[in-house]
From Swiss-Prot:
The lineage of its organism: Bacteria, Pseudomonadati, Pseudomonadota, Betaproteobacteria, Neisseriales. Keywords: Chaperone, Cytoplasm. NCBIfam families: PRK00364.1-2 (NF001527), PRK00364.2-2 (NF001531), PRK00364.2-4 (NF001533). Heptamer of 7 subunits arranged in a ring. Interacts with the chaperonin GroEL. It comes from the Bacteria. It comes from Neisseria gonorrhoeae (strain ATCC 700825 / FA 1090). SUPFAM superfamilies: GroES-like (SSF50129). GO terms for biological process: chaperone cofactor-dependent protein refolding. This is Co-chaperonin GroES.
Length: 96
């Protein structure tokens, strides 16, 4: 199943969370925090402004992003947990 987001929404796959603390303590699955970084899988065509023009999104598929811990709606596709969120919920793009 493929999810094609509409308007200014993006589909994001969370990056794997660290399962060890900085001091080396291994965290059980429930204790590990959900990561607030992910990879953009798909983007919508953009939001339509008041003038009727479509504004393209600043993010694109493949971008690594930072978002709020409680951003987006969780969905399952092909056994994989993904997030669907608005572009405004994204704090920034991680550049190397």
């Amino acid at each position: 199943m493929t999810i094609r987001p509409l308007h200014d929404r993006v589909v994001v796959k969370r990056l794997e969370a660290e399962e060890k603390t900085a001091s080396g303590i291994v965290l059980p699955g429930a204790a590990a925090e959900k990561p607030d970084m992910g990879e953009v899988i798909a983007v919508g065509a953009g939001k339509i402004g008041k003038d009727g023009a479509r504004r393209p999104l600043d993010v694109k598929a493949g971008d690594k992003i930072i978002f709020g811990k409680y951003s987006g709606q969780t969905v399952k596709a092909d056994g994989e947990e993904l997030l669907v969120m608005r572009e405004e919920d994204i704090f920034g793009i991680v550049e190397k």
